[in-house]
């Protein structure tokens, strides 16, 4: 059977960017940018993206394009006879399942809040405490959460059931174009608020005092971590799209374009959040509290708030659901490639699996609220720790070592694949950096995540 491929280069770029762009762009990037000296952090972050994110992304894409299969079989096609690099492909699959065990639930939260704003569930006259309290009410309702979570699972698998071009690519292209338009409209509106100048000054104006307060080491560490984790590298989510690529463009050039789209969304998210927070005198935070407890009262209290709140959560639905679709495609591709089953059968089997696997996260805030499986963390944070703290950094290190070591694919073969086509190319003199410095940086990030 001939392997599926993207219908266009734009489709590849938007689907890959959709995989990278997610909730972390909104609920983490703006906060750590403001905390770490604004413009200085953005500068260090961009440098870290070029030095860390782009090279590792090209390695995942190169394994996919070179092997023309999903992770397990791509490794087998490229590894030396008798070696066991392909075992990592199974860990990639486990990482994708783990990620979807909680990401589908969080996406369900976004859908829930989009519906609340659209139908007037949040309205003028509600107090800030009432609006913020609705998040706790939602978490305490397992039935409601399960419905929205399973809605995400079913919708995602239905889209993917239509195939790469007619399903994933077609839907993601529309979502990503709408997402980019929405975030520009929301940012422009935020910049018209009375606290916009003060908010943007805190967000992006370079501040030496802030760096002194938190330390240059903290700035560099946060920049490295954000550059690494924002792209969701290490579990094969990008590798599968490499297997669907053409040979017409170089991988470094395409990786840079994906990073530009990801960074644009992250920067625009801050342009939405900080002006609103400073206008209403609210301290900007991070994580779910920012999205579900800090921002909804602000939307309700601003002119036309229901409209702007609806647009914001529609943007969040697109940002999170594009990641869900991308990872679902990876899971389905592994099942089709490795077990030789049809896409329809892979969808049916994984529909049951993902519907069941998503329930522990749903129950972790209510029925199983006393269950803290890892280091005292609740279910969602435990699942996230396994993915972000272990599988992403270790997986990225495995991809890197496979691509640059003589025991794996080998640096020369990797660079030849990465440089195939038109566009930006890696120079051969980068070999020592890729073989020694880059692995050390990933080990540092991994160890910091454990501390």
Predicted segments with their positions:
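Transmembrane helix-boundary motif of multi-pass solute transporters/channels
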Residues: 11-48, 236-242, 253-256, 260-261
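Inter-helical loop and helix-membrane interface segments of multi-pass membrane transporters/permeases
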Residues: 3-4, 32-36, 66-91, 104-165, ...
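Membrane-water interface regions at transmembrane-helix termini and the short interhelical loops
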Residues: 32-36, 84-100, 136-140, 151-175, ...
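C-terminal membrane-solvent junction of multi-pass transporters and transport-like membrane proteins
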Residues: 88, 93, 339-351, 382-442
